[in-house]
Amino acid sequence: MSEKIAILSAYSFVNIEEPESLIPKLLFVGKRKYVKGTILLSKEGFNGSFSGSYESVNLVLEELKKLTNTKDVNVKINCSEIHPFQKLKVRLKKEIVAMNVDNLNVNLFKGEYIETKDWDEFITKQDVIVDTRNDYEVEVGTFKAAINPYTETFKQFPAWVEQNAELLKGKKIAMFCTGGIRCEKSTSLLKSMGHEEVYHLKGGILQYLEDTQNKNNLWQGECFVFDDRRAVADDLAPAEGYWLERK
């Protein structure tokens, strides 16, 4: 029986003075170990999702930690029968998740994490539940009673927040996204604007599904993912009918 492919997603908001200098080092390590996927680098940190053997993806993760001098990394690992990525790319970006808001300090303004085991009970008591993902993702699946901002890109989310200031004012706000990184920025944005009670699902939808198996059926549908699987079911297996056919 062949070894399953590990899919590792990791992000960290850590100051990187010269992110471009990391590109050849990460490409060298990743390609040598037959790792595939995408790693985004910027001065605000890194955000990557890549696949390979369990040993190989963890070696790339350790290289990322070493090069950025950080241990504070949000990590998620699951498995697949084949690579969901076709090659390794390491890219330099202005932001590791593009919101297009200048001078937003994610480490200064932070929403409060809600653990996956507490999420179901928590969202049944909250005033506002916001799905921070894009409309095409929400259409595939979302939590019951969640608000869909109907954005086409994450850069449109700040405008939605401004347009819905009265809806959000003085409310307890619960937010969620696929793997957690967009919620780091969206909750930071709301906190920086003066909203006090802002919370988000730790580890995102993927961690929630792994930990809870959607036992209370508050999650409805599948979870859109940005690789060749396109969507995963409650058990994180590729959702039927979504796998991207390769040419």
UniProtKB/Swiss-Prot annotation:
Function in brief: Catalyzes oxygen-dependent 5-hydroxyuridine (ho5U) modification at position 34 in tRNAs.
Record-given protein name: tRNA uridine(34) hydroxylase
Listed InterPro entries: Rhodanese-like_dom, Rhodanese-like_dom_sf, TrhO, TRHO_N
Disulfide bonds: none
Reaction(s) catalysed (UniProt annotation): uridine(34) in tRNA + AH2 + O2 = 5-hydroxyuridine(34) in tRNA + A + H2O
Species of origin: Rickettsia bellii (strain RML369-C)
Pfam family, one: UPF0176_N
Swiss-Prot/TrEMBL GO biological process terms: tRNA modification
Classification via PROSITE patterns: RHODANESE_3
Coiled-coil boundaries: none
Ranges for domain Rhodanese: 123-217
UniProt keywords, alphabetically: Oxidoreductase, tRNA processing
Sequence similarity: Belongs to the TrhO family.
Active site as annotated: C177 (cysteine persulfide intermediate)
Protein EC: 1.14.-.-
SUPFAM superfamilies attached to this UniProt entry: Rhodanese/Cell cycle control phosphatase
GO MF term list: oxidoreductase activity, acting on paired donors, with incorporation or reduction of molecular oxygen
Domain of life where this protein originates: Bacteria
Alphabetical list of NCBIfam families matching this protein: PRK01415.1 (NF002397)
